[in-house]
Amino acid sequence: MKKILVSACLLGENVRYNAEVVEVSDSIKALSEKYEIVPVCPEVLGGLEVPREACEIQGLSGADAIDGRCAVLGNKGTDCTAAFVSGAQKSLELAREHDVEFAVLKERSPSCGSTTIYTGKFDGTKHPGEGVAAALLRRNGIKVISEEQL
């Protein structure tokens, strides 16, 4: 069976920044009938705890953080950039280890957002962009889609 990477929070795992568990959607359940699911939470892989500060990228996209052009900051001012980049690298290693077909990642997440992320102002505004892990996966040829595109 072919494998896909899926954000662990979309699978009902307790990994979200606020420790809220999200119910597994029917579209995610349907994927498990066609693919072997490889769960991933880049933020936890990078060493961040649950719960943790809400974080936002202080640049246009996750690629900026990967390339050292901006930081990923928590809402209390903590610089979480190294954890986000490390988690993205470990997510890429996991994707390669399992030879995944593609990744389904959580939209608007500073790690996993694939088309939209928060602006970095912590005021709820969003703009086009991708999270750190989504950017690194794409940079390495892995297709990334949002759960909202299923």
Sequence positions of predicted segments:
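Short, well-ordered beta-to-alpha junction loops that form the rim of enzyme active sites
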Residues: 9, 106-109, 149
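Extreme N-terminal starter segment of soluble prokaryotic enzymes
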Residues: 1-4
